């Protein structure tokens, strides 16, 4: 994330890392279903985030759901919530929904183009993360 004079509220921080989330997966908890018309994999996870604007832990219930249709196209949706403190030291929660779509021809890509959505009860996080910039 940016330097000491960075403003969070309503300022686009192009090319700067604003949060780095560390995810932990227990492979024994992964569930999957594969049938003639597609495949579903549910990957529960835990984790945390430390950044200049927010520090917190993922509450139980975080899951990444990957659905692949018969044509081999995949939809991925991760939903999880953090509890922690914002930049001002106030306790808050941050919900994250991250959606990505990958065509059969793109499955081997190193990264997936994903589109996050944030909901929070923190005024400072809400002003920044609720903008249509991600």
Task: Please provide the spans of the model-predicted regions.
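Beta-strand-enriched cores of mature, soluble protein domains
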Residues: 2-134
């Amino acid at each position: 994330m940016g330097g000491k004079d960075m403003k969070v509220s309503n300022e686009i921080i192009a090319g700067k890392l604003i949060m780095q989330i560390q995810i932990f997966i227990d492979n024994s908890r992964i569930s999957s279903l594969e049938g003639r018309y597609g495949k579903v994999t549910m990957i529960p996870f835990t984790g945390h985030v430390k950044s200049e604007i927010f520090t917190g832990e993922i509450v139980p219930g975080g899951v990444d759901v990957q659905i692949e249709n018969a044509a081999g196209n995949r939809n991925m949706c991760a939903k999880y919530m953090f509890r922690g403190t914002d930049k001002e030291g106030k306790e808050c929660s941050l919900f994250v929904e991250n959606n990505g779509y990958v065509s059969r021809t793109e499955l081997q890509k190193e990264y997936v183009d994903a589109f996050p959505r944030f909901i929070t009860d923190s005024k400072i996080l809400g002003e920044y993360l609720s903008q249509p910039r991600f």
